[in-house]
Amino acid sequence: MKYKNIFLTGSTGILGKPLLKKLVNEGHSVFALSRNKLNNDFLISNNAKIISGDLFNDDIYEQLKEKSIEAIFHVAGENKKCQKDPSGMFKTNIEGTKQMLELGNKLNIEKFIYTSSAATLGEKKGSIGDEDSTHRGTFLSDYEESKYLAEEVAFAFKKEFEFVSINPSSVQGPGRMSGTAKLMISTLNKKFPPLIKSSVSVVDIDDCTEGHYL
């Protein structure tokens, strides 16, 4: 990757942590968004430059405008299943993504890399779906719908800068204890009965990190 100065969101999540380390180890200057000061020790120890705030803070631009940011990795997102009120997740995943896209436009970046989900892609019976597969038009979860709609917003910015959407399946690795990881662990520990002919697509965190960097 040719870009020197990079802004990274979601830098302390399961994917953000190894991606931050990868970027720094490859010689990039990483400006990491931090909404919680408790995470700052991790960021500082990994040579990231801290940008304080969350996806909706207007002063992020002021903190970055003199940093010559060339690319944004927008990894931050919310993934919670079976919420009674998913409006917070929709705000984070859709409006938060739009905020970062508009930030990239103001910063005159060259490239925006967005962490989406395989759930936004269509299926192909008997084969693996890809970006050319037509989505079924219905959603299995609020999370899937929020990521699909976020992509729709993001693609509108393709004329402003190079836009890349990364669509991993269920990311698994050290430290992952919730979501599908919790389900698989419970099944292995015989605390949850396995479903006949059920399956889930998974991707190793290291492979996912490399895919983002490429």
Per-region residue spans from a language model:
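N-terminal Rossmann NAD(P)H-binding glycine-rich loop of SDR-like oxidoreductase domains
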Residues: 4-26
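NAD(P)H-binding glycine-rich loop region in Rossmannoid oxidoreductase-like domains
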Residues: 42, 48-95, 103
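Conserved catalytic-site region of short-chain dehydrogenase/reductase
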Residues: 81, 118-128, 142, 171-177, ...
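Glycine-rich NAD(P)-binding loop of the Rossmann-fold in SDR/ketoreductase-type enzymes
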Residues: 88-99, 145-146, 203
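Conserved Rossmann-fold NAD(P)-dependent oxidoreductase catalytic core, especially the SDR/UDP-sugar
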Residues: 95-143
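Conserved beta-loop-beta element that borders a ligand/cofactor-binding pocket
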Residues: 152-174
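Glycine/proline-rich active-site loop of Rossmann-fold NAD(P)-dependent oxidoreductases
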Residues: 160-161, 172-183, 214
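A conserved pocket-lining segment of Rossmann-fold NAD(P)-dependent short-chain dehydrogenase/reductase
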Residues: 185-203, 207, 211
